Amino acid sequence: SSSNDQNTSFTYLYPGEYDIKLTVEDEFGLADSTLLPSLVQVDTIFGDVSWNGISQAFDASMVLKHLVEVETLSPLQIEIGDVSLDESISTLDASYILQYTVGLIDALPHTPDEVTGSTGDFMMEDMGAESGMLIDVPITITNAESVNGLKGRLTYDPAVLALDTLIFGEFLNGYMIEMNETQAGEILFAASGNQPNTETGTIVNLTFEVLEGFYGESSVTLSDVRVNENEELEIGAEMTVNYVLGISRAGVPEVFALHQNYPNPFNPVTR
């Protein structure tokens, strides 16, 4: 910004370091200038990625939206959003911001003296299906421990399966969740909160319609999984839908008949 006023003022909307350049010109048109680098320094508040002066739940939602590619944070926003100081932006950062908002954490950044290990095993089960069926594909977690943040990618073949509903499960009750269908057959999700008092539960339940022309097999995959700030798992879990002829009518007889039981086990002479 520039001004020709003798007394000027300017409001800086974003944190950072700003140079000031002063140019003086006399009545004969002769001018001279001086540059004062980083003269104005607007401080940052850890966790305040929205630049509104406070760290709050809205900032946590912006972190999650960045992780699922709904929004893109600037390098400076990523730096101050990294409240765990691990040099990355993660669902755990969003969890710490939420915990700070409700008073569970006294200050940001937050680097606990003892870091609790976080883990969990993800499970999916194979199933049989045929065209026209609706199938439920739950993704569960077992042996969960200190899962305060979770992100992943769900993929499936949209030429075979049409997504009917996606419902996040009871394990994520109370979590802040963001999701984004980045393209047909691909969904990113990220969740932050405090793990409930359970080691097992449903993360998400997907309901698909099996499209016409399905005669082989198709898979649904949970990939790029990261719990808190653990190393990312390339494949968290995977299931296969196999074609099974007539499965929708299995176990439902169309014709009933009653025949003589011979020989009768209770009276062998009966015919």
What does each model-identified segment do?
Residues 1-11:
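Surface-exposed, flexible coil segments in extracellular/virion-facing regions
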Residues 3, 29-33:
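A structural signal for beta-strand boundary/capping segments at domain termini and interdomain linkers
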Residues 13-16, 213-214:
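Surface-exposed, short loops/turns at beta-strand junctions within beta-sandwich domains
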Residues 32-39, 237-238:
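Edge beta-strands of extracellular beta-sandwich domains
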Residues 44-45, 50, 95-260:
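Acidic, low-complexity intrinsically disordered segments
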Residues 45-50, 78-86:
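Acidic, divalent-cation-chelating loop motifs in proteins
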Residues 51-74, 86-110:
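Alpha-helical segments with a strong preference for the paired helices of cellulosomal dockerin domains
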